[in-house]
Amino acid sequence: MVKCRDILQMNLDGMWLLAGEGGLDRVVSWSYVVMTRPFADHMNAGDFALCSVDFEHFGWKEVSDAMYELDELKISGFAISIKDEREEVPVDIIDLAEKLTLPLFQIRWEKASFVDIAQSIGNYVIEAVSYTHLTLPTKLEV
């Protein structure tokens, strides 16, 4: 079983934890790039959400709203990439992650790929599930 703590320990290039350390034991079932609403139509409990903050379609108000909505869906973690890294993450977003105990990660805008990060998380989940199935005891015939 993969947890957000494991994702943090993967030391993915260009991704770090900002807040929500209390939720690092949330179980990660898959990764998903947040793009369209309603999120409930596309996401499942345990999904690790990735989101681009471009300030044209998605700004800090949308991040806050998404955090509440995604937390209700029982996602595992939330990673944001801020266009051109022109702004620091506002304190109210950090505080909200702490309040929800929702692990909030930041992904570097330059030279960090959502596709690579999503694939790395997905591959890690698949490997963990495969390993679990390989090490489960098998029924012995008597």
Name every feature range the model reports, one short phrase each.
Residues 1-136, 141:
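Alpha-helical/coil-rich non-catalytic "connector" segments in signaling and regulatory proteins
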